[in-house]
Amino acid sequence: MPAYRSRTSTHGRNMAGARSLWRATGMKNEDFGKPIIAVVNSFTQFVPGHVHLKDLGQLVAREIEKAGGIAKEFNTIAIDDGIAMGHDGMLYSLPSRELIADSVEYMVNGHCADAMVCISNCDKITPGMLMASLRLNIPSVFVSGGPMEAGKVVLSTGARKVDLIDAMVSAADDSMSDADVAVMEENACPTCGSCSGMFTANSMNCLTEALGLSLPGNGSVLATHADRQRLFVEAGHLIVDITRRYYEQNDDSVLPRNVASFAAFENAMSLDIAMGGSTNTVLHLLAAAQEGEVNFTMTDIDRLSRRVPCLCKVAPSVATVHMEDVHRAGGIMSILGQLDAAGLLNGDTKTVHATSLRAAIDRWDISRTNSDSVRQFYLAAPGGVPSQTAFSQSQRWDSLDTDRENGVIRSKAHAFSQDGGLAVLFGNIALDGCIVKTAGVDDSILKFSGPAVVYESQDDAVNGILTGKVKEGDVVVIRYEGPRGGPGMQEMLYPTSYLKSKGLGKACALITDGRFSGGTSGLSIGHCSPEAAEGGTIGLVETGDMIDIDIPNRGINLRVSDAVLAERRKAMEAKGKDAWKPVAPRKRKISSALKAYALFASSAAKGAVRVLKD
């Protein structure tokens, strides 16, 4: 039977000094035999998804103590990708994921904590904490801050729901008046919480439900709704229960690596494909799998993408549907329920809260359960009042969305498409693969061919789009923006948003070794691997080269002969130390911290995790 890790610092005469320090934090004699639970918070006033978390760590801590544990809270950093977007701040976003994972490891191992509750929300925080959980492999429960309410505006063209992406696109749309743009800006993000569509943050919080590491509703109940408080209260009691099961009953089924197994990663990816989640989730799931020593790869994602249909379309894929609508339709448990009914789910996987994922679905899927409390839970609605306070409203929908033919969540027979919402493409321009969010691609451009317009930075691409250098039918190529080449693998939200604002959203394609925001839609292909800085073919593309994209057949190819590519590669490598770098120096200050990340960063095909030599 495993010994409590915390006893390393709380038991024995030689630990008198450590116990003295523990006492200075408030511990008493009777506390030294109790499990020490780390409450890993991520409160910051910089990020709307985290601005309301300040008191929630202590809410969880009090519940842990009621259940018989000792709670010790600390915070990680948290970067807001939307605020960091469009300037060099975005270089720090993906590397911050590794810092978050490391900081959790440092704190938890440095103080010998027995278990942890992870309070995350936004883009890199949930993945960073997930990586730490699988790295440490101690009992863990995830509870996020919850989604933001969608904005609501009345413009000169009428009333509509809006989100952050709408505000960004409108600002670049010359046909919109300054007054309408101001209305969009002031109303797109009305409350605390992670941005209201199926962007990266919400996608990742939904996936923790499929992995079995969070409670039902974690991905969908609004940050402002009173019902979300129950998740934090239950998390405090649940973590003490599973901690005792592991340390006192030798039940290792509750450990993250046994919960988030290969089959669970298949479930999470199947959910992502079915709900048209952010392409960034691919990057983060691959990284988390590596931390958990799970052999889950791009090949597995490609296999799943060919069999899982698209059952749910949410903003940015459909402008009128947001997370509040997904919740009304039964949330993640109902999407998983439809996958299970279609034979596309591993229902026997473990969870921290139920005997199996299928048992959880039976209880929480509104299509299966007769529970009034469950149905009431999924009636939680937006309050419609701007607020930065958690649990500040208790509005309810009049009815649930149980329509599986034409509703927000659909059955396999009535899927938006039998082809899933994400796809992996392979070809000579991406030998190790690249990712496209097919849920956001118009059917008319699932097959697309056009001449390349090559840019060696996001800034140059934005300038080219805004000054009319990109024309209908072009394939915009943005390279040297990968994990090493950026460094930091910037999101390309501005280029895709500006293509939409110029009316080119359905008339152009974009390929990059960088990545995309969860708010991206259109024929936007990212994570091109190997990246240009690694010697990938994308570094050999020249303006005017024809590129063929074939999503139905999962192909992406540069229409250039192998012989010509070999000549270009030879010429590139002849540049010596200047090979596989932008032709012209970029106005980009790369700090020593970013250089350290670039030195060890792996390919996007491996999750862009750091790879250290033995």
Curated annotation (Swiss-Prot):
Which reaction(s) does the protein catalyse, per the Swiss-Prot or TrEMBL entry? (2R)-2,3-dihydroxy-3-methylbutanoate = 3-methyl-2-oxobutanoate + H2O; (2R,3R)-2,3-dihydroxy-3-methylpentanoate = (S)-3-methyl-2-oxopentanoate + H2O
The EC category is lyase
Catalytic residues per the record?
S517 (proton acceptor)
Please give the pathway this protein is involved in.
Amino-acid biosynthesis; L-isoleucine biosynthesis; L-isoleucine from 2-oxobutanoate: step 3/4; Amino-acid biosynthesis; L-valine biosynthesis; L-valine from pyruvate: step 3/4
Q: Name one Pfam family in it.
A: ILV_EDD_C
GO biological process: one example:
isoleucine biosynthetic process
Q: What family does this belong to?
A: Belongs to the IlvD/Edd family.
This chain belongs to the protein called Dihydroxy-acid dehydratase
Quaternary structure, from the entry: Homodimer.
HAMAP family this protein is in?
Answer: IlvD
Family annotation (PROSITE patterns): ILVD_EDD_1 (PS00886), ILVD_EDD_2 (PS00887)
* Domain of life of the organism encoding this protein: Bacteria
**Where N6-carboxylysine occurs, residue numbers?**
K124
GO MF annotations, alphabetized: 2 iron, 2 sulfur cluster binding; dihydroxy-acid dehydratase activity; magnesium ion binding
Q: Which UniProt keywords apply?
A: 2Fe-2S, Amino-acid biosynthesis, Branched-chain amino acid biosynthesis, Iron, Iron-sulfur, Lyase, Magnesium, Metal-binding
Where along this sequence does the record place binding of [2Fe-2S] cluster?
A: C122, C195
- Cofactor requirement: [2Fe-2S] cluster; Mg(2+)
Any note on cofactor binding?
Binds 1 [2Fe-2S] cluster per subunit. This cluster acts as a Lewis acid cofactor.
